[in-house]
């Protein structure tokens, strides 16, 4: 599948995500270099390397994709700060098969001085396949 032009990846930022993905996020108009990206739509297409023995996406891949999305949302796409996951709880609700397009729109429920609380669902079409709640530690760039 070729993703629309308004989606991109961030190769080189996280080697583990590069290896497992590619994971995509939707870009916004970046003609204003001072604008902070606030668009939080993420997606990936299930390839054979993402699947278990049942040709369904492996749960670890779903967890990694959710972590990719929630950290980018919590850290405003790493334009202002970075973060690390300190807590992650999830529920597997349905399978997703080879070729499925999985999307996520994480919700940043609260930010404190050092933490962000993020939740979300991974979707295939209109169905939820996975839900999560997470806490991340917000960190300044070095």
Model-based region annotation:
Residues 1-142:
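Terminal targeting signals and extreme-terminal segments of soluble enzymes
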């Amino acid at each position: 599948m070729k993703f629309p032009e308004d989606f991109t990846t961030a190769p080189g930022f996280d080697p583990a995500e590069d290896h497992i993905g590619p994971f995509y996020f939707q870009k916004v108009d970046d003609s204003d270099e001072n604008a902070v990206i606030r668009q939080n739509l993420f997606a990936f297409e299930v390839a054979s390397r993402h699947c278990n023995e049942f040709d369904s996406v492996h749960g670890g891949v779903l967890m990694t994709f959710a972590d990719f999305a929630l950290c980018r949302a919590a850290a405003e796409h790493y334009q202002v700060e970075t973060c690390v996951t300190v807590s992650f709880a999830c529920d597997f609700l349905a399978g997703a098969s080879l070729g499925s397009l999985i999307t996520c729109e994480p919700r940043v429920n609260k930010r404190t001085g050092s933490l962000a609380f993020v939740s979300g669902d991974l979707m295939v079409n209109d169905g939820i396949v996975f839900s999560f709640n997470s806490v991340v530690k917000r960190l300044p760039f070095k």
